[in-house]
Each structure stands twice: as C-alpha cells, then as structure tokens.
Amino acid sequence: MDSSTDDTDHAEYRSTELGSESPAELRESSTEEYAVVADSTYSRAQFIEPSSLGYIHIGATVRPRSLPLTLLPIGREKTELLTRLKERARHLEELEAVETATIFETAAMPPLHRLPYIKEHKDSIHLARFDVAVLIETKSPAAAREVQETQAYQTLMDAIQNAATDVHVMASRNEKRIGDVDKTKQGVFIFNYFVADDPEVMLELFDYLAGSYVAETGLDNSTLLVPLDDENADYVAINNARWDIGILRFLWRELTNKSLRSFVQTNLKANQVGAMPVLYRLA
C-alpha cells in the first residue's frame, strides 16, 4: 500500500504558509474532520504494505541519566540487568510464535517534560522516560497475546519489573511502514512515543513528519506501531526506526537542521500532537 499516491483515502491536505494563520484559525477554516495543517515543504513519505507481524513494546524506567547525553559507562547493576534481559530474550525467541526479541538501552533522551505539548498536558501524559526498551516481534498480532501468556514472557517481565520504577507495555500491530528496521546490527535507533488530542490527526500528520525525515536524513526504514484494538495503551502510536550512523553525528545533524526542526515543531503544535523521541542502541 502506497499512501502517498492516493489522497482520496486520506483527509484533505491543506497547504499554507507557516505562521500566516494561527492553528485555531486553520482548524476552523478546514472542512474535513481530520485535515492536517502542514505547509508544502515536504511531501508524504512513501509507504509499503504494513507488516503482518505482531509486536510487544516494553518501555522501562530503570536508571535514566540526568543529562540528555552521556558517554559514561552505565554501571554494574544496569549492565547485569541488560545481560539477564538478553538471555531471557533468547529464550523467548525459542517460542514458535516469536520472530525476534530485541533489547535496547538509551543513547540519548531529551528533557521530555519540557516539550511544548507534553508540558501543557503534563497531568495526563505518561512521560516516556524509558532507558530500557524491549521489542518482541510475533508471527501475527493475535500471537502477541499468546506470547504474553507464556512462562518465558513472564520471566522477562519479572526481571524488568523488579528493576524498574515505571513500566509500560503495548501489544501492537504495524499501521504504516517505510521499510523494516534492521535490528541485527548497531546503529541509532529511535522509539518515538506519540500522544495527541485526536489519534486520527496524529496518524495523518505522521505521513508528513516521516516524509521530512526521509528528505532530510535519508531515512529508509520505519515501522509505526499502534495498539491492538483491546489494548489499554498510554500512547497513540510508537514509531521505530534506525539510522546507520553514530550518535554524535546524528545529534549534530538534528540540532543544526533548522528547517527540519521548524517543520516538525510547527506542525506538532498546529495539530495538538506530542512526540517524545528517545534514541537507543542495541544492548
């Protein structure tokens, strides 16, 4: 499915000069319930058919760093935890219903509580300060539920819950996909945790946010995960992607690209969407 080539399947795209109207004025003038406020700087990302796999994302707050980026060692206790989790992930991969189970640790985390939408809705948002993340890929979305009933999964969860002060679990499916995320080799990985006033608006806006990163960073992979229908999740969606680049170079490119930063921040604000991006590496 290529969502960039058939706008009739989407809400109306309304092009406007950034800053010429307020977000409220733009919304009032829109005739579509799910219209996205965006300028024409970037086009929609080119998507392929969503994956048929199921996913279980686990985010855990174990011992997040006080600084957004630090190159210091993570400490003995956390190192031992990650070693245990990787061992238990290997046991999970022995299950017929599991494709892969991958453990991540943070490489960089911005001050999420200072982000505009997050700050404005601080009393209702689950802050994604997850310095440890697990992504389990299952044979199908239905299989994700089956995996959660297994002893191998519960053993993994016990190890996480014993070490973490906060845990969030989201059984999910793939809603939109640029390409598969290669988790077999090191790189800069992102889990971007989305919240929004209107989930449909967020999903529509994602086409343009992803398109901006394709254009500016050469992004060629991304899997946007949304909760299963019966899942009680705190996030509208979680996006996973990878860049084959070092963390310092990635951050420098992000901080110095004013055009990309302006486009993303302006359109998040205009659409009442919050994004909490956390960068990871393979543990």
What are these regions (language model features)?
Residues 1-2, 6-131, 139-143, 163-283:
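Short S/T/G/P-rich N-terminal loop/turn motif that feeds into the first structured element of a domain
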Residues 133-161:
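Acidic (E/D-rich), amphipathic helical modules within compact regulatory domains
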